[in-house]
UniProtKB/Swiss-Prot annotation:
Assigned keywords, A-Z: Plasmid
Entry superkingdom: Bacteria
Protein name: Uncharacterized protein pXO2-81/BXB0111/GBAA_pXO2_0111
InterPro entries membership: ArdC_N, LPD25
GO molecular function: single-stranded DNA binding
Organism (species): Bacillus anthracis
Length: 589
């Protein structure tokens, strides 16, 4: 018997185009089925939380081909991470965008691709006489594989996706990481998050968990949080309000429909929280239920879902990246902490500017702390490695002394012994950073004092005691660390604008090498933070400008609005805020 090989006939462009359109239409229809009830919508949201790096269309397409998909990527992504697709596995098809750029012929109105423009037409585009338009088409290509189709295991996910989080659990340690991730997101969006009360645009929120507030005729905006929130509630509310800031700020065309705005913010929060292992469905269902029955047409609901997905995906990517960076940094620190520390430099604080210093081994420090009752006890000391023990020792004895790693400190450091300001105490901080922190606080007090003086009030200065630590490399004779104890620095008393000024004025006997190192530390810190002028050792002007802006906000808070403020805009802003609060209170009930 003979077999005739079946001849393969490739599909025409028209057939491929028609097939893509049919699948696209089906996918979009399938997505709309989730709009019918809160339960269906939560199912879609859960999939969004898992596959935030794919569009809603592709998520639905993946789900239809591989219902139990867990973590998908291209063949190349798995290969680059050192893994291979198992033999016989079939790739999932996903939509790939293809963007066409063109201009329209002024006479015929027909599109002309940018690649076929004449020199004259290119010049017209450059001059703005011809407008470039974009058209996005999609084509199907089998490029996605699930991790279960490869030789990789869930433990390998960090290698495949180095900046993404999987199976994130909200432990105490991870809760702090998530807070820092949300803070990084707020900084990226240029939004300040404040607790209600002093310095916030709203003094009292009542039963409202949080609010996004904008100042009319200003770029100033704030998220105000209710101090009565639980720790978990704080996280979900912060994301909800950041979604408002992203989707419904005055630079974006407002929907002017409170239920839809609240739905978009709440669903964004639900998706992001779900990605990090938090179930906020109990709070989200009322918003979703209101939206599913609000009578909007399918097209408007599609737009809402696309906005939510884009925002949630952006938020997750930013937070994931920050958390992954912090985890890698902590893992690196853990590895370093496993190494034994040879010597520590123990500084005991005396009266006024006196200190007692000596170099001992960590073992000696442990023994002394155990038998000498002038030291405070370190809990579970036997279970701690050297690095952990020193940190715990310094925390337990912050009023009396500090132990510094003699061989690890390679640059000028500052230890704040005590302060009336909210400054981190009994920890070695790089001089450039410490100088910037205290300079900023001095500038803040100066600005507060000016405003208080206008009202006949007084703002007290904040007494601070700190020590300058010189690394042993600066001691050419004995090769040992040195402590320079400063007179008390009163932040905001008008004498010094920075610790740097105080040190240069009061410790003139310091060598030129030390003085140059002080300036270099400041310059390097300012350059790292992206400040434009490394020679400028006082950051007062910048801070004062921000304080002037804050002063405008304070005047807004007390209803003493500037004469040139648009009263109508303020009224509209307040009306929208009140409508939001009323709606949220109703949802809470």
């Amino acid at each position: 018997m003979t077999y005739t090989k079946k001849k393969y006939t490739p599909k025409t462009k028209e057939q491929i185009k028609e097939e893509t359109k049919e699948i696209m239409d089906k996918v979009l229809t399938d997505i709309t089925k989730y709009y019918n009830s809160p339960e269906d919508m939560l199912e879609l949201a859960n999939f969004m939380a898992q596959f935030s790096n794919y569009s809603p269309r592709n998520m639905q397409l993946i789900k239809s081909q591989f219902p139990h998909a867990y973590a998908c990527a291209s063949f190349k992504t798995f290969k680059d991470a050192g893994f291979h697709v198992n033999k016989g596995e079939k790739a999932m098809k996903v939509f790939h965008p293809y963007v066409k750029e063109f201009v329209r012929d002024p006479k015929t109105k027909l599109p002309i691709p940018l690649t076929k423009l004449t020199a004259e037409q290119k010049q017209q585009v450059k001059n703005g006489e011809l407008k470039v338009e974009k058209q996005t088409n999609y084509y199907l290509k089998a490029t996605a594989f699930d991790i279960s189709q490869t030789n990789a295991s869930p433990e390998d996910l960090p290698k495949i996706f180095p900046n993404r989080q999987f199976n994130f659990e909200v432990t105490e340690e991870n809760k702090e990481l998530l807070k820092l991730g949300i803070q990084a997101l707020a900084e990226k969006e240029n939004i300040k998050i404040k607790d209600m009360g002093q310095g916030a645009l709203i003094k009292e929120l009542g039963t409202i968990h949080g609010a996004y507030v904008e100042v009319a005729d200003s770029s100033f905006a704030q998220i105000v949080m209710n101090t009565r929130n639980t720790e978990t509630k704080e996280l979900s509310v912060a994301i909800h309000e950041l979604a408002h800031a992203k989707l419904h700020n005055k630079k974006v065309a407002s929907l002017e429909h409170v239920p839809t705005e609240e739905f978009e913010a709440e669903l964004t929060s639900y998706i992001v929280c779900k990605h990090y292992g938090m179930d906020t469905s109990e709070a989200s269902v009322p918003y979703i239920a209101e939206w599913t029955k609000n009578g909007q047409d399918i097209e408007e609901k599609d737009k809402s879902i696309m906005r939510v997905h884009e925002t949630a995906s952006s938020f997750i990517n930013t937070i994931d990246k920050k958390i992954s960076e912090l985890q890698r940094e902590r893992e690196k620190n853990r590895e370093q902490n496993k190494k034994e520390i040879e010597d520590v430099y123990v500084v005991r604080y005396g009266a006024l500017t006196s200190t007692e210093e000596k170099i001992i081994t960590v073992r000696e420090l442990r023994e002394r702390a155990d038998r000498d009752k002038s030291y405070s006890d370190v809990e579970n000391a036997n279970t701690l490695n050297d690095k952990e023990y020193i940190e715990a020792f310094n925390k337990a004895n912050e009023e009396n002394c500090i132990a510094l790693e003699h061989n690890e400190i390679k640059k000028l450091m500052v230890v704040i012994q005590w302060s009336e300001a909210d400054l981190e105490k009994n920890k070695a901080i790089p001089f450039g950073e410490a100088n910037a922190i205290m300079s900023k606080r001095i500038a803040e007090i100066d600005a507060e004092s000016k405003r208080a003086e206008e009202k006949g009030e007084y703002v007290p200065y904040e007494k601070t005691r700190y020590h300058l630590i010189l690394p042993k490399e600066m001691d050419k004779d004995f090769n040992r660390m040195e402590v320079v104890t400063m007179d008390r620095l009163d932040l905001g008393d008008g004498i010094y604008k920075s610790p740097y000024e105080q040190i240069l004025n009061e410790k003139r006997q310091l060598s030129d090498e030390v003085k140059q190192a002080l300036q270099q530390e400041i310059n390097e810190y300012e350059q790292t933070k992206g400040q434009s002028n490394p020679e400028k050792l006082r950051a007062v002007n910048t801070t004062e400008i921000s304080e002037i802006q804050q002063g405008k906000v304070d005047r807004f808070l007390s209803n003493k609005t500037e004469k040139d403020e648009d009263a109508a805009a303020i009224k509209q802003q307040e009306a929208r805020r009140m409508a939001r609060m009323a709606y949220m209170q109703r949802m809470e009930r």
